[in-house]
Amino acid sequence: MQHHPLPEYPRPALRRDSYENLNGLWQYAITGSAGLPAKWDGDILVPYSPETKASGVGRTLQPGTWLHYHRSFVPPAGTGGRVLLHFGAVDYACAVQVNGHLVGGHRGGYWPFVLDITDALNPAGHDRLWVAVQDPTGTGVQARGKQTLRPGGMFYPAQSGIWQTVWLERVPENYITELTVTPDYDARTVTVKAHTSLPGGAANLWAVVRAGGVTIAEDWGSDEADRDGAVTLHIPEEHFFPWSPDSPFLYDLTVGTTQGEEEQRDTVHSYFALRKWSCAPDAHGIMRFCLNGKPILLNGLLDQGYWPEGLYTPPSDGAVVRELQTIKELGFNLLRKHAKIEPQRWYYHCDKLGLIVWQDMVNGGGPYKLWFVTYLTNVFQPLLRRLPDARPLWGLLGRETEAGREEYARELEATVKALQCHPCVGCWVPFNEGWGQFDAAGAVEAVRRLDDTRLVDEASGWYDQGGGDVDSLHNYFYPLRVRPRSRVVALSEYGGIAWPMPGHEPPRRAYGYGTAKSRAELTARWKKLQLETVLPQLKKGLSALVYTQVSDVEDEVNGLFTYNRAAIKPDPAAVRAVNQALEAAFEKIVE
């Protein structure tokens, strides 16, 4: 593992020229108190959690203990303005000091945050950074996904602390803190609003749109922009290139603000796409997902985003790109990002490659009664999948406390705000299989208040309350029978055929849904499932497929890839051929 991992710019949707990456070797200590450790335990490779092999530590942070990080740093070149310290994600709660001064903190293990550290910097240099972290894992109500201190089966080792890139940038005194970019497919426009650090906003906002390096729209500080801090640019018809999996066109966007002196100017670079999601009946009156007004078969994989050496954190940006490119080459166009939020670069690569993402809200809440929420409901799903998620059920689902419900509302808003800039995100998934579920109808309303341009899968699997855009089925055990409904039907989890590929076996007991004994058997069973079980249901309304899963994960050996992504387990040519057959059948059905 390199000593300066993941050097790439971490925030592609809001880029500046100033950038100083702080990934690399830091000092660390795990103690029983929040105070500065008397001594350090050794080095840790940031941004890998201490539980991972890649970190060089291999220790688990227990609830009630503290993980401390320390390093020296040099601020980005230049003078004046402000110096900002960015964290891609820290799990779960942290306090940050620079040169002994508390500069801020954060709670929430999946979302980026930024701290202005200018006033704490040492004029003579020799700046030092200290981060103290706590992570309650399963003892709290916070979002935690599949993390557990007792891994096995469908739950995986906990990870904690810094797990995404840490970086610095120098900005003007009045700088752009956030861009709100709102494309309108039907109007062929994009509206840009810049939020700035000082009261009064941007005194003068300008924006330029380029397509393939050619300037196609610009506004250099109109009166309209001056009044409301936003500007709308019109895309010429000859440069109207809708985004889709077959043609994932991205427009380049440059935005700037000026306010008198040169040092008050700020310029950022971004991008956007023109695309539109909807649900509408096909030629036979059956409800379908539509992208840019045309029915589309969403054919994809469940993606949990784990890596053997780094758990949540990939070994390199290149490894991420290779995985996503291979998924696309196999003929898939969809990934359901399950129980995790990825670093911004992951979504950027999906934007570029044309991979649609259904994004789960990361599950949290108190302890789940798994005998009820997972095992009993899975076995008796036809009877239980539409149980009302009213208050009497909240204790079984881990949402009995007001604090847990408030935490979920905060996390939902943070997720939508963090990811709504990415064209690849096509659907929000508030709940999965009842884990931490409560008032799913209210969650749908909350999502749509934040973002009404995307689909919503209210409750993936079960405890479906009849809302959102998707009738979302999980089926591993029963014959698949689909019938047209008022919402679009998605098979949002299925398959999961296990095969522990020789040389890539899991460290503990293998886990999956039925086991193949060879590559040939795995390929044959996968083809049979897709062509004999799934394909006939397309004409009955099935419009989205999410096979479990992208890769093996810890004990789970039901991936199409091995855990290290070194091999594709079924025959790749067969996978491509089957996906082509599904696409051809769907196109014929909806004609």
PLM feature spans:
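Surface beta-strand/loop "capping" patches
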Residues: R170-G200, A283-R288, L582-V590
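Short, aromatic- and glycine-rich surface loops/edge beta-strands on solvent-exposed regions
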Residues: R128-V131, S247-Q259
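N-terminal carbohydrate-binding accessory modules
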Residues: L179-T180, T254-I327, A581, F586-K588
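Accessory carbohydrate-binding/adhesion or oligomerization-edge regions at the termini
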Residues: M1-A54, A132, P136-V141, G212-V214, ...
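Accessory beta-strand-rich segments of carbohydrate-active enzymes
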Residues: E8-A13, Q27-G32, R59-Y175, P199, ...
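Substrate-binding/catalytic cleft of secreted carbohydrate-active enzymes
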Residues: L334-N579, A585-V590
